Amino acid sequence: MKLNSFSPIPENDDELHLPELVYWASLGELAEVEKSLANGVDVNSTDDEGYSALQAAAENGYLDVVKLLVENGANVHYKGEYTALQLAEMAEHVEIIEYLKSL
């Protein structure tokens, strides 16, 4: 799994336990994110480090996933270490930056 370096990702794979929604969002798997949400997964759930699905999608450049999460109530102002907007800015994902700023 490729994630940008801004993520609070452990060095050891044994420590990497992402919640279902965060995992699928980080990979840009729109259909899996839709399934998770349909199955009642909390759109604002986070991993142990406080990293949300919206942050994962924004950081990794998945605009379609970002939009789906926002449409389903993701908190765009939530800040773990960084907000989703800050992560998108650091990763230079212009379309996501513009979308999040338009909200």
Predicted segment positions?
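Intrinsically disordered, low-complexity regulatory segments in ankyrin-centric signaling systems
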Residues: M1-N39
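Conserved ankyrin/ankyrin-like repeat signature
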Residues: E32, D64-V65, E95-I96
